Amino acid sequence: MKILILVAAGLLFLPVTVCQSGINVSDNSAKPTLTIKSFNGGPQNTFEEFPLSDIEGWTGATTTIKAECPEDSISTLHVNNATIGYLRSSLSTQVIPAIYILLFVVGVPANIVTLWKLSLRTKSISLVIFHTNLAIADLLFCVTLPFKIAYHLNGNNWVFGEVTCRITTVVFYGNMYCAILILTCMGINRYLATAHPFTYQKLPKRSFSMLMCGMVWVMVFLYMLPFVILKQEYHLVHSEITTCHDVVDACESPSSFRFYYFVSLAFFGFLIPFVIIIFCYTTLIHKLKSKDRIWLGYIKAVLLILVIFTICFAPTNIILVIHHANYYYHNTDSLYFMYLIALCLGSLNSCLDPFLYFVMSKVVDQLNP
């Protein structure tokens, strides 16, 4: 419980930075031209122009100049050819939507069946509460997938408006971290029940489980606020499409803010929970090694949880940090392709979580016949 409180406190500290961005210029002409790095857009004619030859020691190499951001919010951006190439690529318009269609077809019925099974369960109230919240989070994610599917199939052209874009983005990221934290709460709950049974017996099971889930929803909502506050929908001039979250205004959402925000998100939302889960289930396996059937059941559950973390959550968070560090320190978005693929893998948890419920329910039933 103390660890969860520490996590909650850490999640509330969002870094505040000053809007600042750099533009990469490699042209040898007398004046710099507007060159926007992939997936970061900029308004037209908002950059200070001066002869590069005036820079002392300039030899024609790549130079970074400071952007002059407009005071008012804008909705139209200019991007480079690499960004447009990605937005029109088969990866973005065919492969990614195909994966999302598969997730929708499997995830919606799987989570509905899980909720139905949970509604019929009369014992192990903690298990019911945790998996109900997990299934609700996964189902919310799945029902927003048609918007993402239509977006990608339409050539990354968003037609559903700014509000829907922000909601979809919040649900997309929020589902992953909600699932991670709920799985962590489940691990803590099983650890207390097995390693400290007398302490666990004194706890009000229903209230304790609902409190933990409530904390998870509040923390995830607070950490998703930047996606709610910052503009996510931008119209691209040259390609005549409107993107949702794929292109951001470097002035409104500076690279320094994005870097520290996503690093803290990966640290508090993935790394710490992963360490807690490893500790809890390792202790459980050690405690139950003399009970063969229960021990084997926990081995299956732990392996499935490790699969979910290894395939779904680890690549997404690792590449997320590297991607934003790459842009923050080197002003390049070259890893965004890999990051989007990792996000697709991260979405698989919405289909794997229902299987985890059926495994865990058997283990709990063996512990409490």
Curated annotation (Swiss-Prot):
UniProt topological domain (Cytoplasmic) ranges: 120-127, 189-205, 280-296, 361-369
Annotated TM spans: 94-119, 128-147, 167-188, 206-229, 260-279, 297-321, 336-360
Disulfide bridges in this chain: C165-C244
InterPro entries named among the record's database cross-references: GPCR_Rhodpsn (IPR000276), GPCR_Rhodpsn_7TM (IPR017452), Prot_act_rcpt_3 (IPR003943), Protea_act_rcpt (IPR003912)
Source organism superkingdom: Eukaryota
UniProt cross-references to Gene3D superfamilies, sorted A to Z: Rhodopsin 7-helix transmembrane proteins (1.20.1070.10)
Site (Cleavage) location in chain: K37, S38
Example GO molecular function: receptor ligand activity
Record's signal peptide: 1-19
Protein's GO biological process: blood coagulation; G protein-coupled receptor signaling pathway; ligand-gated ion channel signaling pathway; positive regulation of insulin secretion
GO terms for cellular component: apical plasma membrane; protein-containing complex
Residues linked to a glycan: N24, N81
Topological domains annotated Extracellular: 38-93, 148-166, 230-259, 322-335
Residues cleaved off as propeptide: 20-37
Entry's localization field: Cell membrane
Function: High affinity receptor for activated thrombin coupled to G proteins that stimulate phosphoinositide hydrolysis. May play a role in platelets activation.
Protein name as it appears in the record: Proteinase-activated receptor 3
Native source species: Mus musculus
